[in-house]
């Protein structure tokens, strides 16, 4: 746990992290738990016993974000929530699917944009009841495809670009109800979704060469930014997307 993460105090806060069983989601969930929050995570398997990772200390909910009925049900169940982190996703091309196929494109948009919108909308009233210092928050996990065209993932890219817009819309509409909405756009960061890309030098080497800080990210890099954006220190920040990318977006 890095010092900047442990410096936050979220004692008593109730946090939901979708896709919190591995990768970036697991890093975010662990950071909130270390800061004193009560953390609920979601995953696709039946129970925590089905995972190799130690998920003790979390409340666990099974959720397939492609199943909108499940998404709506999980959202309705959140009668007390202060922070929602929409993180769950899947790299469809890594499963052999082509996002240029219209049906796969639609799946990608549903997974990475529509599900998060429905989750946030379903949690809105409970978030509005939050008394968390700095206000309740919705966080979306974006990516470099929010800014750059990446040919292999047109659906994912469309969804992550759309995330910037829906984040601003939620911030404008829900701000008067005490709810802030922000996003982070994550660069090449170690996770289950990026494992194949990081293992491929033809992909990872050029990315690293363009990154001024000279390394790929780790989940803790993202977690620190997310905790800041949902903290009282960021109580006047809403509708923004913060790149967490080692400087990739500013490198020519």
Outline where the language-model segments fall:
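Alpha-helical segment proximal to the catalytic Tyr-Lys
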Residues: 125, 172-176, 235
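Conserved glycine-rich cofactor-binding loop
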Residues: 14, 21-22
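Active-site helix of classical SDR
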Residues: 120, 159, 167
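Catalytic Tyr-X3-Lys loop
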Residues: 98-117, 139, 163, 213
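C-terminal helical subdomain
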Residues: 183, 205-237, 246
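Conserved mid-core segment of classical short-chain dehydrogenase/reductases
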Residues: 91-106, 129-134, 152-155, 195-199
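Residue(s) in the substrate-gating loop at a strand-loop-helix junction
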Residues: 143
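Short C-terminal tail/terminal secondary-structure segment
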Residues: 2-6, 148, 227, 238-252
């Amino acid at each position: 746990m890095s010092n900047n993460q442990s410096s936050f105090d979220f004692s008593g806060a109730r946090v939901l992290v979708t896709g919190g069983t591995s990768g970036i989601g697991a890093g975010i969930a662990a950071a909130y738990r270390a800061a004193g929050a009560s953390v609920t995570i979601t995953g696709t398997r039946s129970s925590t016993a089905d995972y190799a990772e130690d998920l003790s200390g979390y409340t666990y909910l099974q959720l397939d974000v492609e199943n909108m009925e499940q998404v709506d049900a999980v959202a309705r169940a959140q009668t007390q929530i202060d922070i929602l982190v929409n993180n769950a996703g899947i790299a469809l091309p890594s499963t052999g699917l082509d996002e240029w196929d219209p049906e796969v494109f639609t799946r990608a948009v549903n997974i990475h944009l529509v599900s998060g919108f429905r989750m946030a909308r379903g949690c809105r009233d409970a978030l509005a009841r939050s008394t968390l210092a700095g206000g309740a928050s919705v966080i979306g996990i974006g990516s470099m495809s929010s800014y750059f065209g990446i040919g292999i993932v047109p659906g994912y890219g469309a969804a992550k670009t759309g995330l910037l817009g829906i984040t601003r819309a939620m911030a404008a509409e829900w701000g008067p109800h005490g709810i802030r909405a922000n996003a982070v756009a994550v660069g090449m960061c170690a996770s289950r979704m990026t494992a194949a890309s990081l293992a491929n030098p033809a992909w990872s080497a050029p990315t690293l060469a363009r990154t001024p800080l000279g390394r790929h990210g780790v989940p803790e890099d993202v977690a620190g930014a997310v905790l800041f954006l949902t903290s009282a220190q960021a109580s006047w920040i809403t509708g923004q997307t913060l790149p967490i990318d080692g400087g990739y977006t500013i490198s020519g």
